[in-house]
Amino acid sequence: MGLSHSHSVETRELVEKTGFSAEQIEHLHKRFKSLSGDEPTIRRGHLNDISDLVLNPIRSKIIDAFFDKRNLRKGPSGYVEEINFEEFLIIMSYFRPLSQHMDEENISVCRTDKLRFLFNMYDSDNDNKITLEEYRKVVEELLSGNPNIEKEMARSIADGAMLEAASICVGQMEPDQVYEGITFDDFLKIWEGIDIETKMHIRFLNMESIPSCR
């Protein structure tokens, strides 16, 4: 995709689909070309080579998220082999900076979208539920990347997070219900009060240098 005047209609369509401005789309198109080596699609290998991801404790989950059909709005499960620029924009829209002019409804939609994306990262088997063990494992992986937290402490914090999640979920259940895992509604309750709208970003794609959405 070129971003010349002849592609203005295509750019407007991308603005409508992703919420990015034309300026932001141009910025991301340059980043896409840099990552893909000027190829029309990005594959896993392109993301594997990003230096900022090498030491990230959830590197594989981040890369998987770019090819997850759920995040690409292509189906309830499975992965694609490669993504084009429009699909790249769809994924990047989950990390879109908030605008100061967004109303409460749009902020709520943005928050839900971000949490759904995060839920999909935890829900590795695509069954619309997160087991407590899956949740504990990801929390531990996230903490393991912090040089100030020892492995045993990371495991202890992750265990605590798992127990807290269980208490929130089980507390909502009827007496005869069997606990099967964290649903998305449960996940929303667990993350209630956490400012995911501004904290969820992706540094290696230089999102912080992109102007806020209008």
Curated annotation (Swiss-Prot):
**Main subcellular location:** nucleus
Q: Which InterPro entries match?
A: CHP3 (IPR052490), EF-hand-dom_pair (IPR011992), EF_Hand_1_Ca_BS (IPR018247), EF_hand_dom (IPR002048)
Please explain the role this protein plays, according to its UniProt record: Functions as an integral cofactor in cell pH regulation by controlling plasma membrane-type Na(+)/H(+) exchange activity. Promotes the induction of hematopoietic stem cell differentiation toward megakaryocytic lineage. Essential for the coupling of ERK cascade activation with the expression of ETS family genes in megakaryocytic differentiation. Also involved in granulocytic differentiation in a ERK-dependent manner. Inhibits the phosphatase activity of calcineurin.
The name this protein goes by in its record: Calcineurin B homologous protein 3
- List residues binding Ca(2+): 123, 125, 127, 129, 134
What is the protein's species of origin? Xenopus laevis
Domain EF-hand, chain residue ranges per copy: 110-145
The annotated subunit structure for this chain is: Monomer. Homodimer.
Residue numbers with lipid attached (N-myristoyl glycine): 2
Family matches, as PANTHER family? CALCINEURIN B HOMOLOGOUS PROTEIN 3
**Alphabetized GO MF terms:** calcium ion binding; magnesium ion binding; phosphatase inhibitor activity; protein homodimerization activity; protein kinase inhibitor activity
Which Gene Ontology terms describe the biological processes this protein takes part in?
cell differentiation; cellular response to retinoic acid; positive regulation of granulocyte differentiation; positive regulation of sodium:proton antiporter activity; protein localization to plasma membrane; protein maturation; protein stabilization; regulation of cell adhesion mediated by integrin
Membrane disposition: Lipid-anchor
- Where is this protein found? Nucleus; Cytoplasm; Membrane; Cell membrane
